[in-house]
From Swiss-Prot:
One of its GO terms (biological process) is heart looping. GO terms for molecular function: chromatin binding; cis-regulatory region sequence-specific DNA binding; DNA-binding transcription factor activity, RNA polymerase II-specific. Transcription factor essential for neural and some non-neural tissues development, such as retina and lung respectively. Binds to an 11-bp consensus sequence containing the invariant tetranucleotide 5'-ACGC-3'. During development of the central nervous system, is required to specify the amacrine and horizontal cell fates from multipotent retinal progenitors while suppressing the alternative photoreceptor cell fates through activating DLL4-NOTCH signaling. Pfam families: Forkhead (PF00250). Residues 371-406 are annotated as: Disordered. Mainly expressed in proliferator progenitor cells in brain and retina rather than differentiated cells. In contrast, is expressed only in postmitotic epithelial cells rather than in proliferative progenitors in the proximal airway. The gene is Foxn4. It is found in: Nucleus. PROSITE patterns: FORK_HEAD_2, FORK_HEAD_3. InterPro entries: Fork_head_dom, FOXN1_4, TF_fork_head_CS_2, WH-like_DNA-bd_sf, WH_DNA-bd_sf. One of its GO terms (cellular component) is nucleus. This is Forkhead box protein N4. The keyword Signal does not apply. Disruption phenotype: Animals display early postnatal lethality, while survivors exhibit noticeable body size reduction starting at P8. At P8 and P20, retinas are reduced in thickness with the inner nuclear layer, inner plexiform layer and ganglion cell layer much thinner than in wild type and lack horizontal cells as well as amacrine cells. In lungs, mutants show dilated alveoli with thin walls.
Amino acid sequence: MIESGIWSRMSEMIRSSGHSHHCSPQEYRFLPPVGDDDLPGDLQSLSWLTAVDVPRLQQMANGRIDLGSSGVTHPHPGALAGTADLHVGAAPRPLLRRSQTAVVPRGVLGLSPIGNHRASAEQMNQFPAGGQASSGLQEMPQLYSPATQIPFPLPLGSQQCPPAGLYGSPFSARPSYPQAHGAMHASQEPHPKHYPKPIYSYSCLIAMALKNSKTGSLPVSEIYSFMKEHFPYFKTAPDGWKNSVRHNLSLNKCFEKVETKSSGSSRKGCLWALNLARIDKMEEEMHKWKRKDLAAIHRSMANPEELDKLISDRPESCRRPGKRGEPKAPMLTHATTVAMAHSCLAISQLPPKPLMTLSLQSVPLHHQLQPQAHLAPDSPAPAQTPPLHALPSLSPGPLPQPAMGRVPGDFLNINSDMNTEVDALDPSIMDFALQGNLWEEMKEDSFSLDTLEAFGDSPLGCDLGAPSLTPVSGNSDQSFPDVQVTGLYAAYSTAADGVAPSAANSAQYLGTPGNKPIALL
């Protein structure tokens, strides 16, 4: 009676599960082909009953144990590895292959394994046991492994092998080590570029930092930052380079300390700036190293294209001192212009008028003047540095006659006072010297002294001397034909009280043996 009741219940459960469950096309690939011969017969059913714990199965049927309700999901796909082609719940899931050695947890089905006949178990595994039965049973009871052994339940969250190895499903979990390995390579930076130590001295690097600051002064910490930013070598260099920077700031005269108002005695508020008197020297030093090895400097820089900017740029507070003194340059030029104007040089900025006159006078050479001359006749003539003196009157009129009485004492000191003006004269004026042989050639070419009067309106006017004076050589009545002009020899002065000039300057006559006399006018 008991066996017939159990058999009727099992047959009804198998038929209901067969009608209610519809396999998807994907599930048909995993199901083995089922033929008419595989359907259970009476003998197979009886043999299966002998391997089942009948009291336990009856208790499950009476208690309406719901193992496959849709609200309860299985803890893990690997937990049902011991079942063969068994569906849990109403929703279709991929079928599981039967494993001979798998052990199902006790808490899942609540059954203890009992050894059964392998042939009958394989026959029963051909049917899907999922789906909801009309009698209330949701799933077919667990089929057991053929060997009788003590169960070892697995934890709910564990699995025997990765699901991807069982199903090959695209949504299954995959090992995470390839992604972690790739992430490690992605996060790892490439090998940093090696920057050599710059060939610039520490003083040049400090000067670059100060020159490229907004105010021209920086604290020590910002100087460090500038060097590390533009020369990456200092990012990984030992800390000794910071001591070298501080020593250069303290000992090098190119840098000076700037005390801020808010700093007081605190060292943190101390700023460093360039010494404006030595800023040009520092720039020259930078350009020298740039010309020496430009490639090495570029290799040591983070941005080599900024080198020219770092060397040449200056803030407003680091402008050259010469730019502040530029108004002095026109004053110097004006003073030089005045000196040259007093030395018979026509300046284009001045109005075109005669500045002074060059007078070639026939002054007699008396024997009584020779004792009064301060230079002996046999002394050589100072042809290289002739005495010059500026004329107070710039009119081209006839010049006063030189007096024979005395020679002023300051006349001999003119040479030392006017050396600078002589050096500043235009060389074309100094080439005006006419040597004796040239004078003779001009005389032979019918060049008379009367033609010199044509220069009267020019800045260099020439007035021929008075007829009352005796010629230079011998007792001849003619005007001196032999004149050697070696420079501008004229010195005149007028009385301060406006009286007609008297005893201004006496002419000096220098004679050299074997050469023609030189007239100093």
